Amino acid sequence: MSLTKFIVPAMAAMAITACGSKTAQETADDFDYTVDRFADIEVLRYKVPDFENLTPQQRILIYYLTEAAITGRDILWDQNGKYNLAIRDLIENVYTNFDGDRESDEFKGLELYLKQIEFANGIHHHYSMDKFTPVFSREFLADRAAKLPADRQPEDLETLLTVIFDPTVMPKRVNQAEGQDLILTSANNLYENISQPEVENYYNALKDTTDATPVSWGLNARLTKQDGKVVE
């Protein structure tokens, strides 16, 4: 199995700040590039030379840009799948409120699943587009969800459990198999109850074939049907 590597620049910046008092040779020798390893993923960080020479205002700007990226990430989660945000909330709440044996196979499986979905921005692998297969049981998650505080209870637990554990439900975030309807068979949240021909016909009707610099249609938009009519 191939190992995917991911770079985390913001974490590197913090590491460099913490190592500012060391010599360059000590910093080079001591720097640990690996943040974490799980499943087929290796999370990396790297050095940011001269970060410590930035002005306070420049560092504050980087901080707020990072915060903006984190905040905007929820848009990507939602676009990647209809139930992604609700599933993330469920798994995070079970993880943080867990009061049992954190060395148990069930909990370790939950922790692995949490890392996978956090890395992929959803319940599908970022490269293969296949839905993650949990290595903890449906019964375990249902039991732990039932013990959450009232304000942490999911609205529709059974639906979330089905999406997580049923391999036939939303198996691919983006399906590119030849001969299949790529819209109906993909789990992303940009289309709902609509087919590939309907999507193509909708956008083809909007195109101005005489425009030498045409606009791009469908960016960050969602197509669905209302009263049998395709709407954006």
Model-identified regions with their sequence ranges:
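Bacterial N-terminal signal peptides that target proteins for export
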Residues: 1-8
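Bacterial signal peptide processing site
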Residues: 20-22
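C-terminal motif of bacterial Sec signal peptides marking the signal peptidase cleavage site
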Residues: 15-18
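N-terminal helix-rich structural modules
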Residues: 29-232
